[in-house]
Amino acid sequence: MSPDLGAGRIGRFWKRRTAAAVIAAALLAASIGGTVEARRGAADPSVITDWNATMVATIVVDAGKANAEGIFWYSFVQSAVYNAVVGITHRYELYKWDVRGPRSASPEAAAATAAYRVLLYYFPASQVRLDAAYAASLAKIPDGRSKRQGIRYGKRAAAHIIRLRAGDGRNAPITLDVPLAAGVWRPTPPAMAPMLIPWLSQVRPFTLRSPSQFRPGPPPALTSPTYTTEFNEVKDFGSKTGSSRSDAQTQTALFFSDIAIGALQGSLRDLATRRGLNISDSARLFAAADLAGSDSGIAAWDAKFHYHWWRPITAITLAADDGNPDTAADGLWAPLITTPPYPDYPSGLCNLMAAVSRSVTRVMSTIPGTVPGSLDLNITSVAAGLPGAPLTRHYATAADLLTDAINARVWSGIHFRTADVVAAQMGTQVSNWALDHYFKRIRNGD
């Protein structure tokens, strides 16, 4: 079997950081009892999941924003929706805003309006889709003063996020210019494309102080024992042909080869619906997961841009130049899946999975009835070549998810193991920072 370097470390790292926070949160949740929001039972939480689905269709399907760029845009929408809801329900602290709406306002109208206005501002080409979704949302809400107040407040919530993100550095003309040298990233086959969305490495984060706040130390040196071990592991277990992978390992590798960011949003919608989250908790779940996920991508791109470490396919092809007598070159080697067009270290997927799973675990720990440390996430993959696709896997804990994600990127042949292990630690740090500073419960709030 493949050596599972790092999975145990991730589990221990997760458990240490989780135990105290989860126990405290569970005790707080149990002590709160029924809230004003729960007692009045008026707000329909489906507006949150409905607009999350519309957001994905707009950003991914219509605009073609994928990978880390897609979840970056999600954060614009989910932060506005979150503010629009909790500014009325008074359940959680506002995100970088201090304007609350009237308690009599409709949070459904506010949420729908905030999502609609943000999406229409940035993606006007989707107006037909957005107009139809907005009309459908408003049709479910009785006409009257509450609805009008909600619409007005939702407009203010959207305008605030648009102002807040002005001049954040997105789409800046940044390129990665590095020398051709051992250990240095270069475009990979078959596309030989330049680094994708390099501006993400320097864009203003949503919750972090800077993109480099959690920048890790450098990857293992080319002549180190760790590099040698990981080189030979990915060369053996990540090869497209003649590998030592088992069928189960290949299936895991393929499963994570196409965990689209849109599919992950579907996992969150499923969780919110299954657990019957109210409108405030649902808005908080999406905001915490997406803003932490977005910042994990920014942090990953910062480190990728800073270290510009080569991918396994380059390392294996050019091993004769790495100065390591224990690595052997193979000019015909190819990975199981196509290598993405950006540097190896750290892994973007593992960073994202860690940030989202940590956020979900912490948010759900405040919901009565949640098993401490539980993730309870259903994730569906539509990857080409995956037997039985679309295929859904259930992950009971974040540690289980991260173990699979880390191994998958090695078995896919696109990452050295350290890139995945370090990324998982980074994503957890990003999420902890986000939830330690934002989305906090208002004591004695509704």
Task: Walk through the language-model features, giving the residues of each.
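Bacterial N-terminal signal peptides
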Residues: A21-S31
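C-terminal region of N-terminal signal peptides and the immediate post-cleavage residues
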Residues: A30-R40
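N-terminal secretory signal peptides that target proteins for export/translocation
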Residues: M1-K15
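Internal signal-anchor transmembrane helix that establishes type II topology
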Residues: K15-A21
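Acidic/polar surface patches and capping/hinge elements
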Residues: R39-D446
